[in-house]
Amino acid sequence: MSKVWSNLAKVVYRRTYSRNDYGLQENWADTVERVIYGNVKGLNVSEAEIARLRYFMMERKAMPAGRGLWYSGAPSHEKLGGAALNNCWALTADSWENFVIAQDLLMLGGGVGLSVEYRYTSKLPRVKKDVSIVHQATKDADYIVTDSREGWNELLRRVLESFFVTGKSFSYSTVCVRPEGEPIKGFGGTSSGPRPLVEMISNIGGILKARQGR
């Protein structure tokens, strides 16, 4: 890093934007290259334009958004595409599937505005009666939640489909979800463990059971 970096800037950069995807901690030059090529990939951008962008970033005369600084060009960018670069989305509560989409987008790190006006919620199906979603601590459950964003979203999809479409009860297990505090490589941070997921499903079940038949 350049000597002109303040101590606070160094701490913030190391803590928030310097990635360690391949076993080596990025320095600022590494981050600049990752972000540049993550943004220009597939575009008709000249070497002169890339050099100009590199100059402005190295001298910190111009910066991408913080989300782009962390995510652009990372392995998870290759896997997920540009959705995780967005800060916010807007959805309407006119289908149960939109609640699954909302959770997926939230787990990408953005904010989701969900309109629950009656003109939208009145389009939701009636809640099926006598649906029971049971959490088990074994691998004998009907659905084993995988240790991934996709696994959590699939569980929510199954729960809502049971209450709004099939009326079928089922059990699920979180034995494969990593324990609380373990690192998350793709987006950084640490795992919350399965407890918030179990609590969420329990709360959703309670709300929908109170509305069964309506």
Question: Model features per residue range: what roles?
Answer:
Residues 1-214:
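Extended catalytic cores of very large enzyme megasubunits
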